[in-house]
Amino acid sequence: MGMVSEFQQFAIRGNVIDLAVGVVIGAAFGKIVTALVEKIIMPPIGWAIGNVDFSRLAWVLKPAGVDATGKDIPAVAIGYGDFINTVVQFVIIAFAIFLLVKLINRVTNRKPDAPKGPSEEVLLLREIRDSLKNDTLKSG
């Protein structure tokens, strides 16, 4: 079997296609969560604690300046505000995945309904058994 045909069989399998669909949907969901966090969740939180824009929060290690030749030197800073936004995004995505997995587990682990009574085969086998018992008792 050639390499191309092996790859085609691999790529056409349902699991690979499902994975690809999951990656695309996950990327789109990530963008939605990013917009939710940056545009809807964090602004009211920032407003509540004093008009703080979390995306701009940083610890400046070295302020921006100009060197002797007049060239701008950018500031050196640790942008912890973006980190806070990313953590909030992660928590939202993790919670959504948790709920999805919980739902999938509930659906797949559903116990089948208990049978309402013995099947026709079982009833027939019982009749045969009882008939054989009666025949052996009569002949014995």
Swiss-Prot record:
A Pfam family reported for this protein in Swiss-Prot or TrEMBL: MscL
InterPro entries recorded for this chain? Answer: Mechanosensitive_channel_CS, MS_channel, MSC/AndL, MscL_channel
Keyword tags: Cell inner membrane, Cell membrane, Ion channel, Ion transport, Membrane, Transmembrane, Transmembrane helix, Transport
Q: Which family does it belong to?
A: Belongs to the MscL family.
Query: Which one of the record's GO molecular function terms can you name?
Result: mechanosensitive monoatomic ion channel activity
Q: Where are the transmembrane segments?
A: 16-36, 84-104
Cysteine pairings via disulfide bonds: none
Its encoding gene is what?
A: mscL
The protein's matches in Gene3D superfamilies, at most eight in alphabetical order, are given as:
Large-conductance mechanosensitive channel, MscL, domain 1
Q: What membrane topology is annotated for this entry?
A: Multi-pass membrane protein
Its name, as the record gives it, is Large-conductance mechanosensitive channel
Q: Does the keyword rRNA-binding apply?
A: no
GO cellular-component terms in the record? plasma membrane
HAMAP family (UniProt xref):
MscL
User: Does this UniProt record's set of keywords contain Cell membrane?
Assistant: yes
Q: Where in the cell is it found?
A: Cell inner membrane
Reported function: Channel that opens in response to stretch forces in the membrane lipid bilayer. May participate in the regulation of osmotic pressure changes within the cell.
Q: How does it assemble?
A: Homopentamer.
Q: Which domain of life is it from?
A: Bacteria
